[in-house]
Swiss-Prot record:
Keywords in alphabetical order: Lyase, Metal-binding
EC number: 4.1.3.17, 4.1.1.112
Keyword Transferase in record: no
Subunit structure: Homotrimer.
Pfam name, any one: RraA-like
Organism (species): Thioalkalivibrio sulfidiphilus (strain HL-EbGR7)
Lineage: Bacteria, Pseudomonadati, Pseudomonadota, Gammaproteobacteria, Chromatiales
Top EC class for this record: lyase
Full protein name: Putative 4-hydroxy-4-methyl-2-oxoglutarate aldolase
Function: Catalyzes the aldol cleavage of 4-hydroxy-4-methyl-2-oxoglutarate (HMG) into 2 molecules of pyruvate. Also contains a secondary oxaloacetate (OAA) decarboxylase activity due to the common pyruvate enolate transition state formed following C-C bond cleavage in the retro-aldol and decarboxylation reactions.
CDD domains reported for this sequence: RraA_family (cd16841)
Binding site for a divalent metal cation: D104
Length: 161
């Protein structure tokens, strides 16, 4: 069965059905969006304390995709906030997973979009435009590859090829 046919299948069920073929992210994320279960085709951004490429990517049509941001696990500033959450929602993104921090949680939690992150930080990021888009990114003992499908819910994050 094609991964797209799973829709919002629970991550625990995907692990039971696919065993070792289901890649489980070992990073423990908090849920910050108004939706806690989401899935979609992976689009990636690799950046460090600089969210210019995150903004540029979310300004494109999302078509139900999920943006996976590898911020290097930095807890020193936010890579995503309420304005980017609204941009993602307006452009049809299903969700955003940030290996780093976000801010403006009081607003983001009211929006119907999935958002997972390591934590929160009130400081905004730099604006240098450094990083890479649509490259494999690795964290939490898993690699997220553009075009694969990611599933996220209260139990965690799972990738199916």
């Amino acid at each position: 069965m094609e991964p797209a046919a799973y829709g919002l299948t629970a991550t625990a069920d995907l692990c039971d059905q696919h065993g070792e073929a289901a890649g489980v992210c070992e990073t423990h994320f908090g849920d910050y969006g108004g939706i806690t279960a989401f899935s979609g085709e992976i689009v990636t951004v690799r950046c460090f304390e600089d969210n210019v490429l995150v903004r540029q990517t979310l300004e494109a049509e999302g078509r139900g995709k999920v943006l996976v941001v590898d911020g290097g696990g930095s807890l020193r500033c936010a890579l995503f906030g309420d304005m980017l959450a609204q941009t993602a929602l307006d452009n049809g993104w299903a969700g955003v997973i940030v290996n780093g921090c976000i801010r403006d949680v009081a607003v983001i939690v009211t929006l119907p979009i999935g958002v997972k992150a390591l934590g929160t930080h009130p400081r905004k990021s730099e604006k240098r435009g450094e990083g890479a888009v649509n490259v494999p990114v690795s964290f939490g003992a898993i690699t997220f590859r553009p075009g694969e499908r990611v599933f996220a819910d209260e139990d965690g994050v799972v990738v199916l090829k």
